[in-house]
UniProtKB/Swiss-Prot annotation:
Recorded coiled-coil stretches: none
GO biological process, one term: methylation
Function in brief: Methylates ribosomal protein L11.
Main location: cytoplasm
GO function terms (MF aspect): protein-lysine N-methyltransferase activity
Keywords, sorted A to Z: Cytoplasm, Methyltransferase, S-adenosyl-L-methionine, Transferase
Family, similarity comment: Belongs to the methyltransferase superfamily. PrmA family.
Enzyme Commission number(s): 2.1.1.-
Protein name: Ribosomal protein L11 methyltransferase
One Pfam family from the record: PrmA
Amino acid sequence: MKWNKYSIQTTTDAVDMISSALNDIGIEGIEIEDNVQLTKEEAKSMFVDFIPDLPPDDGRAKVNFYIDSEEDDGSMLEKVKAELEDLRMFIDIGEGTITESETEDKDWINNWKQYWHTFTIGDLFIKPTWEPETEEMKGHAVLSIDPGTAFGTGSHETTRMVIKQLQKYVKDGDEVLDVGCGSGILSVVALKYGAKHAFGTDLDPNAIIASEENAEQNNIDKKQLEVIEGNIIDDKAVKDACGYECYDIVCANILADVLEPLSTCIHEHMKHGAYFITSGIIDTKENEVAEAFKKNPELEIVEINHDGEWVNITARRK
């Protein structure tokens, strides 16, 4: 099936009104393109591999919608133009021009799989669930994940750096805390390298489901990995559930703006001599996060690593 894609050139202030108008005339599946930065609250709730730094918001935006090319007789486009003219009477919609292009409907659910194959980080093999284990993998740790459902796949620089640090610092029998655990793959990796138990926290309830699925896929006993929803920074119930001074390793692959307040209190959950492994830090935020770590007298930075424009900071509790 082919689709006609229409893009309305407008302003960020007009996006909501235009989207509502399109919905009112029967258009669904609206797509918005802009450079509006996330608020701090929005950022805290997003636990993906990374969030790219956008160019400055210049007030411009695109609202895209799609019409089946076989059913597109031009009548819907005329309705859209009429709606835009009506909106001009009340708000500034900017250019309000519409450009057209054609796109082909593909099996997006499965076609991307042809580009995703097994890769390694150190001696860890990370493979998609549809690929079998090979002779080469025998005797090595293997992480099997479904990239279609996981929050993070391990391929991004931030995740890769944390995994390398886990390979370096995890010891047999360790207790691990995974803050902002997302898909739980860092916890699963730690368990594969000898950790006894991992406890994860995340603001997104879907993280619990994703972590459970990844644990099951990797033959991790349910008792070895626990995940709860909540904010470890300021929710006492979550802090109590995690426990105090009981972790050998704490990992957090989250945004710099969250790592800064986390660094003021994370030592409460760490044993003396435990490691705090972090990433999700864009290089422009490195000094800011490092200074936040240094302000906590309980922590000392032992490593700072770079991969592309991303940074890992590993600290130890004194």
